[in-house]
Amino acid sequence: MPQYRSHTSTHGRNMAGARSLWRATGMKDGDFGKPIIAVVNSFTQFVPGHVHLKDMGQLVAREIEAAGGVAKEFNTIAIDDGIAMGHSGMLYSLPSRDLIADSVEYMVNAHCADAMVCISNCDKITPGMLMAAMRLNIPVIFVSGGPMEAGKVKIQGQVIHLDLIDAMVKAADHSVSQAELDDVERSACPTCGSCSGMFTANSMNCLTEAFGLSLPGNGTVVATHADRKQLFLRAGRQIVELCKRYYEQDDASVLPRAIATKAAFENAMTLDVAMGGSTNTVLHILATAQEAGVDFTMADIDRISRSVPCLCKVAPMTDKYHIEDVHRAGGIMGILGELDRAGLINRDVPNVYAKNLGEAIDRWDVVRQHDVKVHEFFKAAPGGVPTQVAFSQDRRFNELDIDRTHGCIRNKANAYSQEGGLAVLYGNIALDGCIVKTAGVDESIWKFTGKARVFESQDAAVEAILGEKIVAGDVVVIRYEGPKGGPGMQEMLYPTSYLKSMGLGKECALLTDGRFSGGTSGLSIGHASPEAADGGAIGLVEEGDTIEIDIPNRRIHLAVTDGELAQRRAAMEAKGEAAWQPVSRERVISPALQAYALMATSADKGAVRDVKQIQRRK
């Protein structure tokens, strides 16, 4: 029978000093036999997805204590990728994921906590906490702050739904008046919550449902709705139950590594492909698998992407639907239900609130389940009032969207495409693979051949795009922006948004060893591995080279001979210490970022630390 971890610091004569300190935090005699549960919050006033989380920790804590546990809250950092975008701040975004994972490990292990409730929301916070959960392998439940309501603006008498990306695109479109741009800017992000499309934050929060580590609705109930409060309350009660099952009943099936098995990773990736999730999810799933000790690789992602159809299209792929519309259509359980009917989901994987995923789908899929309470839950609607206050409204849609032929969520027979929303491409320019969000690519350019326009920084590429130096048929190559080369693997949202605003969204491609925002659409291919700074062939591309892209056949090819490529590689290696570095880029790299770059792996490994370097130093 496992012993409560917290007994290390709460029991025995030698722990009198530790108990004195625990007492100073408010613990009483009767608390020292109870599980100590870490409430891992991420409140910050810098990020709209987190501004409303200040009171959420105590909301969960009260439920934990009412159920017989002791709750202790701490906060992690949280970076807003949208605010950090387009300047040196973006260098810090991806490294913050690993810093969050480390900080959770430090706090939980230093204080011997028995379990965790992770209150996450935005881009790097959910994956950072997921990595920590797998690393620590103690009972955990995730509950997110929830998605933002979609913005609404009236242009030329027509009400248009919009989001952050619309503001970025219109800002670079000089045909848009300043007055119209001001309206869009003020309306795009109306409430607290994670940005309203299927961007990285919402994608990751949806995936926690498929992993079995969060409750139904975690990814889709808007932050402003009163129903989300119940998710926090249930999480507080359920984590105490999981603690008792593990520590008092020796039930190891409730541990994260028992839940997030290879089959669970396959389920999560299947959902990701079906819902057209952000390409960043690939990075984070691979990183989480490494922490979980699960052999899940780009090859698995490639296999899944070939067999799973795209069942859901949400902004930025379309302006018709946002996350609030996915919820109305049955949420993630609705998508999983369609995947289940298509035989594409493993029903037997356990989760934190039901016997297994199959039981959860049977209970929560609105197509097969006619329970009034379930249907009412998925009718939770946006309030339509700008606010930073959580649970501030209880509006409901009049009816659900259960049209699986023409609705937001489709069945397999009526899929948006029988090809999934993500694809892995391989070729001589990316031997270890690269990623494209096919759900955001017009099918007319799934096969594309163009001339390389080579840039060694995102800034240089943006300058060329806005300077009208990029023309139809170009392939914009942005290199030395990978995990090592950036460092930090910047998101390329501005270049893709500006290509779209210049009318080149369907006329050009973009290839990078960096990554893309979940808000990116168009023929945007990222995560080229190995990256340029790690000796990848993307570092050998020359201006004017022909690049061939073939999504249906999962191929990307630099059209030069093997001999020519070998000569270029030899010439690069001959540069010695100057090899595999950007030639003309001025960028100040702090010691903190240098430390990250020193051990970062390429994107095909999740951009995690190369632990072999640590092992070699033992």
UniProtKB/Swiss-Prot annotation:
MF annotations from Gene Ontology: 2 iron, 2 sulfur cluster binding; dihydroxy-acid dehydratase activity; magnesium ion binding
Residue positions, PTM N6-carboxylysine: 124
Cellular component per GO, a single term: cytosol
Binding site for [2Fe-2S] cluster: 122, 195
NCBIfam families in alphabetical order: ilvD (TIGR00110), PRK12448.1 (NF009103)
Protein family per UniProt: Belongs to the IlvD/Edd family.
Cofactor(s) required, per the database record: [2Fe-2S] cluster; Mg(2+)
Record: residues binding Mg(2+): 81, 123-124, 491
Entry protein name: Dihydroxy-acid dehydratase
Catalytic center residues: 517
Cofactor, free-text remark: Binds 1 [2Fe-2S] cluster per subunit. This cluster acts as a Lewis acid cofactor.
One Pfam family it belongs to: ILV_EDD_C
Reaction catalysed by this enzyme: (2R)-2,3-dihydroxy-3-methylbutanoate = 3-methyl-2-oxobutanoate + H2O; (2R,3R)-2,3-dihydroxy-3-methylpentanoate = (S)-3-methyl-2-oxopentanoate + H2O
Pathway in which this enzyme or protein is active: Amino-acid biosynthesis; L-isoleucine biosynthesis; L-isoleucine from 2-oxobutanoate: step 3/4; Amino-acid biosynthesis; L-valine biosynthesis; L-valine from pyruvate: step 3/4
Gene of this entry: ilvD
One of the protein's GO biological processes: L-valine biosynthetic process
Keywords: 2Fe-2S, Amino-acid biosynthesis, Branched-chain amino acid biosynthesis, Iron, Iron-sulfur, Lyase, Magnesium, Metal-binding
Organism phylogeny: Bacteria, Pseudomonadati, Pseudomonadota, Betaproteobacteria, Rhodocyclales
Subunit and interaction comment: Homodimer.
InterPro entries named in the record: Dihydro-acid_dehy_C, DihydroxyA_deHydtase, DiOHA_6PGluconate_deHydtase_CS, ILV_EDD_C, ILV_EDD_N, IlvD/EDD_N
Function: Functions in the biosynthesis of branched-chain amino acids. Catalyzes the dehydration of (2R,3R)-2,3-dihydroxy-3-methylpentanoate (2,3-dihydroxy-3-methylvalerate) into 2-oxo-3-methylpentanoate (2-oxo-3-methylvalerate) and of (2R)-2,3-dihydroxy-3-methylbutanoate (2,3-dihydroxyisovalerate) into 2-oxo-3-methylbutanoate (2-oxoisovalerate), the penultimate precursor to L-isoleucine and L-valine, respectively.
